[in-house]
């Protein structure tokens, strides 16, 4: 509640600075607050308030680089505070509402292909640094799993994910990645049927982008078909994309173990499918 109140207070400053009028109830996400607003010219927009951290830093830069191509359009931004003024989309109609998961995957993949066609600008966090950090943390995580009941299988799975990641880590790529593109981060829009929101900018290989869309709606199955559809739509080498996706499972698993949690059952299922188990 303290963070929420602080962000709302910041919002008052930017309502005044950018000549905005609030016209609805604030929407609160995991790390941000969004105010529906109207600009002085009558244009409807969204004021996004958040703290700057390693995931949100550079969001304005990424949106400016994409220039609204397949993604929400940036109208104003303040890099110091991470505050963004964005075009208004229909928050009540996420891509997750499309009943056919394969159709939703096709739409997401086509948007992702547009985003990852763009080279990352200078100043965006790079995948090679992320991967190096993962390998630095891996030994301690593996050691923490030693001797735990039922953890030997988890340990082997992480070792296999790490082995796959090592095969591609030498070519980390240079595309501008979203890093968190799943069906809830695509909203219906007016100028296009669907637009992407909430990037966590990263420069790297598009194969590192696929896991969120496999994990989201995991229970609806068809994971192999969804993986193939995404790799085909993006024009990715399937084996490299497989390795990067296993690397993404490794990344999320490292975080979970370090927080004292077990591996995510659904991500384990995705990894086993990609490993042919």
Stretch-by-stretch model annotation:
Residues 1-71, 189-193, 261, 270-277:
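Conserved NTP-binding catalytic cores of kinases and kinase-like/nucleotidyltransferase enzymes
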Residues 6-11, 15, 117-178, 189, ...:
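An alpha-helical support segment within catalytic cores of ATP-dependent transferases
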Residues 27, 33-38, 46-47, 74, ...:
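Active-site acidic catalytic loop and adjacent metal/ATP-binding pocket
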Residues 41-85, 92-115, 221:
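A conserved alpha-helical element in kinase catalytic cores
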Residues 104-119, 123, 127-129, 199, ...:
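Conserved, surface-exposed functional patches that form binding/active-site neighborhoods
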Residues 144-146, 225, 252-277:
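ATP/Mg2+ or Mg2+-diphosphate-binding catalytic cores
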Residues 188-240, 262-265, 270:
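Active-site Asp-x-Gly
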Residues 244-245, 249:
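Short alpha-helical scaffolding segments that buttress acidic/His motifs in well-ordered protein cores
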């Amino acid at each position: 509640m303290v963070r929420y109140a602080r962000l709302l207070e910041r919002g008052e400053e930017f309502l005044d600075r950018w000549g905005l009028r609030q016209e609805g109830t604030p929407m609160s996400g995991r790390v941000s607050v969004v105010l529906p607003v109207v600009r002085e010219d009558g244009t409807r927009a969204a004021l996004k308030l958040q703290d700057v951290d390693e995931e949100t830093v550079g969001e304005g830069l990424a949106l400016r680089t994409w220039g609204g191509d397949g993604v929400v359009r940036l109208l104003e931004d303040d890099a110091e505070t991470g505050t963004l003024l964005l075009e208004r989309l229909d928050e009540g109609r996420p891509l997750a509402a499309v009943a056919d998961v394969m159709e939703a995957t096709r739409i997401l993949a086509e948007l992702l292909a547009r985003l990852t066609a763009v080279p990352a600008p200078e100043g965006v966090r790079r995948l090679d640094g992320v991967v190096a950090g993962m390998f630095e943390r891996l030994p301690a995580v593996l050691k923490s799993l030693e001797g735990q009941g039922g953890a030997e299988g988890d340990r082997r799975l992480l070792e296999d994910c790490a082995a796959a990641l090592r095969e591609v880590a030498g070519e980390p790529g240079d595309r501008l990645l979203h890093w968190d593109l799943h069906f809830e981060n695509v909203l219906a829009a007016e100028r296009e049927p669907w637009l992407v929101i909430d990037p966590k900018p990263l420069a790297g290989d598009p194969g590192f982008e696929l896991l969120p869309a496999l994990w989201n709606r995991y229970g609806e199955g068809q994971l192999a078909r969804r993986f193939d559809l995404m790799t085909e739509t993006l024009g990715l080498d399937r084996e490299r994309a497989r390795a990067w996706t296993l690397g993404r499972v490794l990344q999320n698993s490292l975080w979970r173990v370090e927080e004292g949690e077990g591996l995510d059952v659904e991500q384990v299922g995705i990894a086993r499918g990609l490993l042919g188990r």
